[in-house]
Amino acid sequence: PNGSIAPNFTITDINGESHQLYELLDQGKPVLLDLFAVWCGPCWNFAELGVFDDFNEVYGNSVFVVAVEADPTTPESSLYGGSGSIGDWTDVIHYTLANDDFIGDSSLYNLNYYPTIYLICPDRTVSEIGQGPSSGYWSIQTLAEEVFNYTCDPMTGINVGMQSYNSELEYCGDGKIEPIVTISNTGFETITALTIQTLIDGDV
């Protein structure tokens, strides 16, 4: 959902280059993620428009643009056409292109339709900025408005936040609580020490 923390992933594009989401975000660049399927008509129509290609040409130094074939039932070879694929996707997508089963086979990105387009900020928060047929009406201007209307907070020296919490939400005073938390630092400085305090009814 919007405002949640984007799960990390590593993809290998069709040129054999590996890209890890968090490493890209740590460079201070937002990531524009287009999740599509090779059999999806609206996905093909949108790709043919060349909006993402044009956006990448103009804003590629500020935003990392990537298209991922996310249907776990289709092999990477389907990107080049053949049975079950609308056509050769390398003819219509000229920015970073990959096939990845993990993204589509998990519920992490809540894929309910193709295409689904996410903007992921350097602080790892994710926003859905487009889906389905609506993206077919975009131009580079409207896409830029969609992207830059979502203001990503600038990276600071240290920016620590809790990414997940796994424990009981209620405590009746008996026994002990052993919470499991995941924290992340989206700043550009390394954390050398960290203190975590647990409060119960406002008391440490």
Locate predicted features:
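Surface-exposed loop/edge segments in extracytoplasmic proteins
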Residues: 17-20, 126-128, 203-204
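A short beta-strand-turn-helix
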Residues: 10-31, 57-58
